[in-house]
């Protein structure tokens, strides 16, 4: 019996919508990363993008445990001397709740060209509405 290697024509992409309200951030990101990567499918191959497309709604209502709202920091650097900026999770959820989930999922995907392609299939919205009704997404309970 030969080892099965999927071809691009063998890959079927389904659309799923995930409601992030009252979900723990890390557990939600882990489930979304598995679906984006395609590890839940039989035809998974680590060198190919076999994953599904995921729509996350209500990103502003995501929860964390403990005191992470004040203790967790997001860092970025401008490239200039003394240009290190830090933002707390509470501020990020107030200003850009989509980026909180995107950064959490990004850390769970491969750090290469394939991981960047997988991240493009993730659509995140702070509210309930999303413009992807034409794709007829199925609801995914995580």
From Swiss-Prot:
Coiled coil segments of this chain: none
Gene Ontology biological process: negative regulation of translation; translation
Keywords, ordered alphabetically: Ribonucleoprotein, Ribosomal protein
A GO cellular component annotation in the UniProt record: cytosolic large ribosomal subunit
GO terms assigned for molecular function: mRNA binding; structural constituent of ribosome
Keyword Endoplasmic reticulum: no
Similarity remark: Belongs to the universal ribosomal protein uL13 family.
Subunit structure: Part of the 50S ribosomal subunit.
Protein function: This protein is one of the early assembly proteins of the 50S ribosomal subunit, although it is not seen to bind rRNA by itself. It is important during the early stages of 50S assembly.
HAMAP family, A to Z: Ribosomal_uL13
Protein name in UniProt: Large ribosomal subunit protein uL13
Organism: Solidesulfovibrio magneticus (strain ATCC 700980 / DSM 13731 / RS-1) (Desulfovibrio magneticus)
């Amino acid at each position: 019996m030969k080892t099965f290697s999927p071809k691009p024509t063998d890959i079927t992409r389904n659309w799923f919508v995930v409601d992030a309200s009252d979900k723990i951030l890390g557990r939600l990101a882990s489930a979304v990363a598995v679906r984006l990567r395609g590890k839940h499918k039989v035809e998974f191959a680590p060198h190919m993008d076999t994953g599904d497309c995921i729509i996350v709604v209500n990103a502003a209502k995501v929860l964390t445990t403990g005191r992470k709202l004040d203790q967790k920091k997001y860092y970025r650097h401008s490239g200039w001397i003394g240009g290190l900026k830090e933002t707390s999770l509470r501020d990020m959820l107030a200003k850009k709740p989509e980026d909180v989930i995107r950064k959490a999922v990004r850390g769970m995907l491969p750090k290469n060209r394939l991981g960047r392609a997988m991240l493009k299939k993730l659509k995140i919205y702070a509210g309930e509405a999303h413009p992807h009704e034409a794709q007829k997404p199925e609801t995914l309970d995580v």
